[in-house]
Amino acid sequence: MTTVVKIGGARAVDPAGALSDVATLANDRDEDVVVVHGGSTAVDETLERMGIEPEYVETPSGVVGRFTDAETMEVFEMVFGHLNTQLVAGLQSQGVDAVGLNGVDGKLLYGPRKAAVRVLEDGKRKIRRGDHSGTIKQVNAELLETLLTDGYTPVASPPMAGKDDDEVVPVNTDADRSAAHISGALDATLVLLTDVEGIYADPDDPSTLIESVETPAEWDELEDAAEGFMGRKVMAVEEALSGGADEVIVADANADDPILSALSGGGTHVRASALESESDTSEGE
């Protein structure tokens, strides 16, 4: 069994428990684990220390994301490189033979650069140019499988390798969706760790945790419940399952033994059957 674990970058997320669980899975249980990490909060904090205001834009479809100009891209690379090294060192300290890499290494995450993005400003649709972001179209699963076979635990992160005419350039991409594409390519279980227990039917009420999503009707309810940042995680869930992952779990990074707890039933569990159309379901009956 291969498990892909995405460690979030929010201020409220402590990676210590997750790193301990990765060590348990990799060393004690001899299971394959790939770690993917974010770091958006650290990027914002670094920009602010430099006197630069982080810029977020809204697309016409209502999705809010970072606008990554050239200066922000440089900070992004610096911050993510630092975070990656810290996580690798943390795992090495626990006896895990971890290897750090980003999406540019070996074209781990590859796709076209989006230099221009459609945005919604003051109720009007506009095109913003100069963005350094990309859309993942390919995952170098062979690279990860080679590392896993040789006993290493990959620790991966954005940026991705963006195709820009005849060049390959580092560009920003969402860490949740990076983890989704990697888990799909490896036919793995994806654990998305965040700063809440899972996905709530009522976003303001933790007692409404959605524990299991296995049918198209339950999937519709999940999509309706996802608001704000959780909406982006649901997009990642869909991409992972559509790409080949067998299950996605959204769980609390700050729980005791967060990964082991998630794999044992904690959090919100979404199965690939939730994305089957009604025609697919009826054909199987």
Give, region by region, the residue ranges found by the protein language model.
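Active-site loop-to-helix "anion-binding N-cap" substructures in soluble metabolic enzymes
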Residues: P60-R66
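C-terminal catalytic "cap/lid" subdomain
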Residues: T2-P60, T72-E285
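An acidic, glycine-rich surface segment that forms the CoA-thioester-binding/catalytic face
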Residues: D69
